[in-house]
Design a protein with these regions (language model features):
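Short, well-ordered alpha-helices that flank and scaffold nucleotide-derived cofactor binding pockets
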Residues: 16, 45, 72, 76, ...
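Glycine-rich phosphate/pyrophosphate-binding beta-alpha loops
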Residues: 106, 211-244
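Carboxylate- and glycine-rich phosphate/diphosphate-binding segment that chelates Mg2+/Mn2+
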Residues: 114-220
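Gly/Pro-rich interdomain helix-loop hinge
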Residues: 235-263, 267, 276
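Glycine/threonine-rich beta-strand-loop-alpha-helix active-site module
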Residues: 38-140
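ATP/NTP phosphate-donor binding region
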Residues: 1-54
Length: 276
């Protein structure tokens, strides 16, 4: 997790319950946005020293991704160099059990097969794709997301919307992923503004919408927005959702001109009143 979630009492909602049933726990709260190789190493050391049986990831995409990397390396120590996990990871053993508790409605890291780490020396991000890293349990509870400031709700919400749009328009899309992405766009487009304004029902809808988008794009991948957003995050430390928000309109216009399904996409979304 990160220091902010500890200081504002979000982590205590979990650890207090663990105390009630007599579970022993330790904590690593050094995660920062765009987690680095160094952060993964620090978290791994804390986990190994604790002797714990499983990991709990509390936070947005950065704590989730950090926890995934720690879990994978713990059971596959031959990949202690995180860089060796880039791309399609050749691990043989499942991750240490991970319980994911997202506190933002955006990344869907709790259901995807990938995680993103920043190489602080080379100032680049790299994506690790590994079916072994999916958390065993995900607690998607809108109550854990209530404390997000409006700016974070907006940024993470656009990340979720970008997942849905890119998953829908990617060349690998097919009938099942189209169904997931269209539904995700419908949910997110109808809830994002009200969620930022603080409406409870909209917050619950965003929690669902980002999850559905994650189930979709985890099967087909993403596109140019994320391809360009990752370098922005690595080089300028731009928050991921903000980078997506900057790039998404431009990539959508590019895709509309150069991809064969743009009219089909637009017609479908207009019929569902997702766009005007």
């Amino acid at each position: 997790t990160d220091k902010t979630l500890v200081q504002c009492g979000v982590v205590a909602k979990v650890t207090d319950k663990m105390d009630e049933v007599g579970l022993v726990w330790d904590i690593y709260s050094g995660v920062l946005p765009n987690p680095t190789i160094g952060i993964v190493k620090e978290g791994l050391e804390v986990f190994q020293h604790s002797g714990a049986d499983y990991l709990i990831a509390i936070g947005g995409g950065s704590p989730q991704d950090t926890c995934k990397a720690i879990g994978i390396i713990s059971n596959n120590p031959e990949f202690a160099d995180v860089r060796s996990l880039e791309g399609l990871s050749p691990t043989r053993k499942p991750s240490v059990p991970v319980l994911a508790i997202p506190t933002t409605a955006g990344t869907a890291a709790e259901v995807t097969i990938n995680y993103v780490i920043t190489d602080e020396e080379k100032r680049r991000k790299f994506v690790c794709v590994d079916p072994h890293d999916i958390p065993q349990v995900a607690f998607i509870d809108a109550d854990m997301m209530d404390g997000m400031p409006p700016s974070l709700k907006a940024a993470t919400g656009v990340d979720a919307l970008t997942h849905a749009i890119e998953g829908y328009t990617t060349r690998g899309a097919w009938a099942l992923t189209d169904a997931l992405h269209i539904k995700a766009i419908e949910i997110i487009a109808g809830a994002l503004r009200d969620s930022v304004a603080g409406e409870r029902d909209a917050g619950e809808a965003m929690a669902l919408g980002q999850y559905v988008a994650g189930m979709g794009f985890s099967n087909v991948g993403l596109g140019l927005v994320h391809g360009m957003a990752h370098p922005l995050g690595a080089f300028y430390n731009t928050p991921h959702g903000v980078a997506n928000a900057i790039l998404l309109p431009h990539v959508m216009r590019y895709n509309a001109e150069y991809t064969g399904r743009s009219e089909e996409h637009t017609s479908e979304l207009q019929s569902r009143q997702c766009i005007s």
